[in-house]
C-alpha cells in the first residue's frame, strides 16, 4: 500500500473519533465538561484503532459505560473517552455448561432479558442496576450476597498499549468486593462469558417476576436518575476497628447526622431516600456535588473520627480532592 492509500485508510479507520464532545449528557449525574476526543467503537478493529490513536497522541483514556458511577470534572476530560458499542450476545453449550458471551458495551438489563429469553437463570438478581457488561465486570457487580464473579467464566480483553487481544480465565480478573484486575487499566474488556442455569418455562416466568420485583424494590429505596448511586464506599472492617466503630455502612453515620434530604450545595442535595446518594435537582455542576460531598466527608470525620472516601470514579481531576 502506498503512503497516500495508507493515510486514507487510517483516516477512514479513525473517522468515528469525534472532537470536543460534551459528557454531561452521557452520565447519570448529568454534569461535567467536554472530552477532548470521544468515540463509540462498534467492532474490535475500531476498538484497536481507538487505542492506537490514544497511544500515538499520548492521550489518557477514559472507558465509559452507562456513566452511573462517575463524577466528571467541569473542565471535562483531556484525553480520549471510549464508550464501547460491542452489544452482541451469544448462547452456547460447552461441556454441559450453558454459557452466554456478551460484548462489553451491552446494557446489563438487556443481557438479563437475553438470558431469560433463552430460559437461563442467575443474572436476574442484578436487575435494575445501571451498568454495561464492561462496567459490571470492572467492579464485580454485586447486589446483597450475589456477586457477578459467581457466574463469570472467562473474558476477552484488549491491551491498552499494544491492542493485543486474548482470552483469559476468571482467575486472571482476581475478583473481590468492588474489585477486579481491570481497575489497573492496562487491559480493557471486549466480552465476557457467564455460566448460567437452564430453567423451565414456568421457572422463567417466575424469574421474570423476580426481576420486576427487584427493580420495584430498588426504585422504592433509591433515586433512579441524576445520581451515581452510593457516592462513598463503605468502610473496610479494618477501618471500622481502628476507629473503634462497629458499622461499616457510611449511610449509617450520615443518617445519624440528620443529613438525608436536608444538606445541599447549589442544586446538589443528599437524597431523601438514601443518605449516601447525591441527586442533581436539575442544574447542579460537578463543583456543587464536590462541595457537598466534601462537606459530608468533613462532618462524618468530625463527628465519628472516620473518613469516608468516594466509591465513584473521579474523571478529569488533576488531583483527588478527597485525599488532601
Placement of each model-derived feature along the sequence:
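Short loop/turn motifs at secondary-structure junctions and domain boundaries
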Residues: 147-149
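Short polybasic amphipathic segments
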Residues: 89-92, 153-157
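Anion-binding (especially nucleotide phosphate/pyrophosphate-binding) glycine-rich loop
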Residues: 2-136, 141-143
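Generic beta-strand structural signal
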Residues: 78-80, 98-100, 121-125, 135, ...
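Phosphate/pyrophosphate- and phosphate-bearing ligand-binding catalytic cores of soluble enzymes
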Residues: 18-19, 25, 70, 158-160, ...
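Short amphipathic alpha-helices in soluble, non-transmembrane regions
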Residues: 10-13, 50-54, 207-211, 292-296
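A common structural junction motif
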Residues: 56-60, 216-219, 297-304
